[in-house]
Each structure stands twice: as structure tokens, then as C-alpha cells.
Amino acid sequence: MHKGAAKTRPVQESGMDSRHDSIVDHAVEEEANALPGKHCVYSSLRTSLRRYGVNMAESELFMLCGSMCAEYSGDLKRFGPEKYPEQLQEMAASGGPVIRVEPWIAGVSDETDLLRVLTSGYGTMLHTSSTALTYHDVYVKNYPRGHVIELCGLDLGERTAQVNDSFLLDSSGQAMTYVGPARLDDLMQGIIEYAWLVEQPVRLSPGELHAACAYHIRQYVTGHEAVWRGVPSPDESANQTGKAATGKQVKRGDAGYRAFVDDFRLLADMEDQDFRTYCHEIYYNLRLGSALHLTDYTADYCLRHQATLGPQAQHVIELAQSLYADWHKLNLYIYKTGLQLRKQRIPEIRERALNLIERQRHMLEKLMVLTEQAAD
């Protein structure tokens, strides 16, 4: 189900100049005044694909990656979509662009690996620790988190990289973009994985998008793993070994949300500092990647595809917008509860969250019916 011709695009056609120690994509300058994205994974995909003539919205990429199926394995600090490589694998298996992901191995990987993938002529993305992004103080001063940016150029002589960060949250929480240089040696200290398009991407039809969306909603409802076949996954055996070694059961989708919220009960017995920390992490995880993105992207997806989803799409939009507002209110309440050490609020928070999860499932089931009909 992979799209696109399996051939390498010459570097010269992609707007790049290269020599033995550097490569620069001049087209990246067009992104300097672009609107910031809503999430680093999908905004970096969006801008990378657009450079090759494929215009896809973040909401479409979110659906294509199956990212609505948030995962929970028993750690309240960790809740959200699958790991970065697995999301990209889901996208390719759903008929979307094929992207290869390689782990960055300390002491083995170096700048020549980055130069190699840049010279393939297709978009390159870096999954990094935010502390390595020394081009902005907000990354250096705050808690380290995973972040995805585009790599658009290298100058090995100057030891700089040209990057496009399309979802930079400043200290006030305002999203903006950064297009410019990054210190290469700092950057390489934090790379987790690097990824690149392996072939010319092709835009999916609305029917293909709807089929993938319906499939992933069914995953959300049932909690089942993906059953796609024929997608390269060099790390598959290692990932399975890692999962077996942890001995933890990963719950996905609706079941993942319910297990996550059920464990809020553990907050009541925590020491004060731990209580504050966990409430902040819960707030962060609901805000980025799970509930708030799910509802926002659902509304946007339906708005973009009303013509093919039919008049009932408006009802789903209204459900999504209402849910977004209520998740936002509850999430702020969780944040304030942590700051104020109001542990007695936890039963109320759990009850409100479970109600929202029920409404969320109802919304997605409505969308699943519409996408299944539109995919036929």
C-alpha cells in the first residue's frame, strides 16, 4: 500500500546545493514566515511533504499515523501516541508516505550519516532531546523532552546545521517557528533518531484517507494493535524484546485512556512534591499528543472533508469542539490542583475525565461510521 515511485530524486531538483562538506536547501527559506504548527511530529511532516508538492494538513497526518490511539503502561508521567518510529510505520502501512527511521547510536553515528540522508534529495527529520536545541533558551532552561525538527542543511566546515522548527513553544506557551542555524555538535549530542522520506511522496485520495481513519478509530475502540503487513521494520524484534522485558501491559485507545484516568487515584497518597510533579506531567500529556490534540484534529479533519463525509460531519465537528473546551477546562483544573496541593479533588477529577472519555468514544464512533461510508 506504499505510495510513490521507488526512485531517488536528484539533489539538484530539490532546490539544494551541495559540495563534499555541506548541503543547503534554499527552499527552507519559504518556511520562515509560515504559521507554526500544533504538534512537532505532524507539523514537521507537513512542511517536509509540502516541499515535495504534497499538501497534507496536520489533522490528516495525525489520523494517518493512528496517533489517536494513545498508549498507557502504568506510568502516570507517560501517556500519549506510540513512539515516533511506530507512528511513521503506521502512516506508511496506512498507504501514506514511506519514511525510514534509524536510531542515533552514540559513538557510532556521526555527521556523515546526516549528510548521506540529506543528499538523497528527500526531507529529513530529527527526533532529538530538547536540551540539544541550543538555538533557543526555552529548550535549554526547561525539562528535557523529545522534539521533532526538520534538518534542511549542513555545513561541516562551520559545524552548523540549518533547521526548521515549526512548533517552538515559548515560555508563555505561544507556538512559533524557528528557521535558522543550530550548532551541529550540540545537536548531535541529543539526536534520538533520524528519519527521511525514501521516495517521492504522493497525495492520498479522500477515500484512502477515510479508510485509514476508520481503521485507526476501530483500533481506538477495540484497543487492538495494528495488523498491517508488508511494512519494513528493522527494529521490530528489538522492540518486541523490550516490551517483553518490561513485563508491562500496554493499553491503547479507549482502554488506555480509562486505565490512565483510573490511576489518578494513586495521586492522593503521594508526597506533596511528587503530587505537584505528577499533576504537571498529566497536564502536559493531555495537552500535547492526546485529548486536546485528538479533539482539535478531529474537528479540523471533518471541516476539511465535509464534502465527502456528508452533512453529519457538522455534528461531529460540534462534538469535537465541545469536547476540546471541556478537556481544556479540566486540564487547567488538574494543573491548578497540583499547584494548590488539593488532593481531595482527585475523585472529582477522575469522574469528570471518565465522562469526557465516554463522550470522546461516542464522537469517534460517529466519525468511524462516516469515514467507512465515504471510503466505499
Protein language model annotation of sequence segments:
Residues 13, 17-56, 60-202:
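Conserved active-site-adjacent core of cysteine acyl-enzyme catalytic domains
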Residues 282-376:
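Charged, long alpha-helical assembly modules
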Residues 5, 10, 22-27, 249:
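Detector for intrinsically disordered, low-structure N-terminal pre-sequences
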Residues 156-289:
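Noncatalytic regulatory segments and standalone regulatory/sensor domains
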